[in-house]
Amino acid sequence: MKKRLLSLTLAGLLAIGAFTGCGSSGSDTKDTKEAKSTQEDSKEEDTKAGDKGTITVAASATPHAEILEQAKKILADEGWDLEIKVFSDYVQPNLVVESGEFDANYFQHIPYLESFNKEQGTHLVNAGGIHYEPFGIYPGTKASLDELEDGDVIAVPNDTTNEARALLLLQDNGIITLKDGAGLEATVNDIAENPYNVEIQELAAESVARVADEVAYVVLNGNYALQAGFSVAKDALAYEKSDSEAAKT
């Protein structure tokens, strides 16, 4: 129960941080500014980081740990000490929460969480949604989807839900067609039509970007795209839309 409350606290304060980062309207009066200043001074006197306890969070480097570093300042004002540890894969962050070594993690979407629980027998729960990172198709040896040729190789993540997102994105762009109802559990076995005879190379999510100079295209999770120096807006040849099935999870 304590871990659940800590996780909910973190999720809530992350949301507060997002709103705070948008800036003020600039319409504060002198009185409201003075009132805010008084409240902040009182808060600083009454609350110190760690007074309420420590929250330990496992996260992927980009952008999750970066977001947490900003949230750390807000949490400190609320009396919490936030300890962040960066992991490079999608397995250990869940295992350290399951074992009780960490209070929470920040890196995954709900379908992956549910799939992990099912496959690993873990008991993790969603503490709250924070933000959405779209999957994207990024250039490898080909600079445009118009250059797609028969037999090209496309690298995708190999874990259940992220592979499905990659395949759904390829389908949305006319590269393959999946069996009806495959959805977020789709695998390469669900490819019904492959007009370009593309070869799907399945790799651990953290390894996909590393083969960009060896394959025609790579399909990347948002965080690994950022780590590889890709921008969804500038570099993605195609990406998940805000109303996609994955975006609703």
Where are these regions (language model features)?
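Sec-dependent N-terminal signal peptides of Gram-positive bacterial secreted proteins and lipoproteins
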Residues: K2-S25
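Pocket-flanking alpha-helical
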Residues: Y90-G121, A143, A225-Q227
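Alpha-to-beta junction loops
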Residues: E98-Q108, D152, I175, Y196-E199, ...
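Bacterial lipoprotein signal-peptidase II cleavage site
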Residues: A18-T47
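Short, well-ordered beta-strand elements
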Residues: G50-T62, W80-V86, V153-I154
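Short helix-initiation/N-cap motifs at beta->coil->alpha
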Residues: I84-L95, G183-R210
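A conserved helix-loop-strand patch within extracytoplasmic ligand-binding domains
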Residues: T47, A127-I176
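Periplasmic-binding protein-like
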Residues: G129-P139, L226-T249
